[in-house]
Amino acid sequence: MEDFLRSMTMKDIGTSLISADQFVTLFNSGETVLLDIRYPFETRLWGMSFAVEIPLNELPDRLAELPRDKTIVCACPLDIRSNIACQYLLQQGFKAKILLGGLVALAERLRGGAANDLKFDRA
């Protein structure tokens, strides 16, 4: 972990962010998946049915559930825990980004009729 931290630059940090609009575009093209790293008591309250749900503390043991050919967009309610998850995934060789503003920003982006902007059928 120390070597990873020493290798980080401001460029790395800036390229790790993705907006809710950018996420929707990439999700619709099949290039990304949403990783919801909240704990079960949080996802029971409100969830994102299209997300892969892996609590942050289980992430090291469940890496095999994540595709290596897509960008993993890490998300939590804001974007605090997702920073940790993103950096961990990058260290493990995944392509990963942080959802800017977190799930709150994504929920706001998809509010009401805008929910139709997210395409689930990519046949």
Segment roles from a protein language model:
Residues M1-V33, P40-T71, I80-A123:
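Rhodanese-like catalytic fold shared by cysteine-dependent sulfurtransferases
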Residues A75:
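Short, surface-exposed ligand- or partner-binding patches at beta-edge/loop junctions that are enriched
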